[in-house]
Amino acid sequence: MELQKLHYSVAEGIATITMDYGKNLNAIDDQMADELIFCIGEAEKDPEVKVILLNSAAKAFSAGGDIGFFYKLVKAGGEINMDSLIGKVGKITNGMKSSKKMIVAAVNGAAVGAGFPLALSADFIIADEKAMFILAFVNLGLVPDTGAAYLLCKSIGEKRTMKYAATGKPIKADEALALGLVEKVVPPEELAAESLKLAKKFVAGPLVSYTNIKKQIYAASFSDYERFLDDVENPTQHECSNTEDFKEGCAAFMEKRKAAFQGK
């Protein structure tokens, strides 16, 4: 597959996947999703790869969904169907959680919308001091998708997840550390070195043990993840994406103003 928005390399047992769609701050569209699925799959089946490192070459980790694309769908009229893209990103997060290999995410700047669960699907997150995690879906009149509600509930519980999902309140780096979402917070200039250091630690560790630890934790905590994505998340997001509030949320975002929701 010819990569347009990612870079993929393997060295010293580490597969590095670098998102590099800087113009749109690594917004996740169909092309980006397809490339992530491909690269994670390549790393998973490569016996030379012991650890996966996910990072960004842009000024943010990921801006989430491409709202400009959504706005074009809104303006075109008719039923809006984001099931395919949401399904692809759900496949990415589920693939990361069920991977046999340890995954480290280096989060710089904002991880917004779908970018949040993308980071959260890694086994360990190293964040820089400017990192910010935001469930921004509600600001568009949507619900969390790509596994965000599920993954965050598993990590910090129902009440805290409700707080961030219903308000869109950012979780800053120091708060993410206190909540146990990230392993370490470092200055921006140290992020690359610290995340690579952790990845190398796992390369030199008991790999069979790591694989089976992941298998146990996935079975204990995430065995119903696919059912949640298919039976709960996709239908609720489909309903929300065909409301007047979603149209208004997209328009407000593009016009850089506060949304005037009507509750319908």
Residues covered by each model-derived region:
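Glycine- (often His-adjacent) and acidic-residue-rich active-site loop
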Residues: 56-94, 111, 224
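Conserved CoA-thioester-binding segment of acyl-CoA-metabolizing enzymes
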Residues: 1-57, 94
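Glycine-rich phosphate-binding loop at the start of an alpha helix
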Residues: 64, 83-86, 90, 113, ...
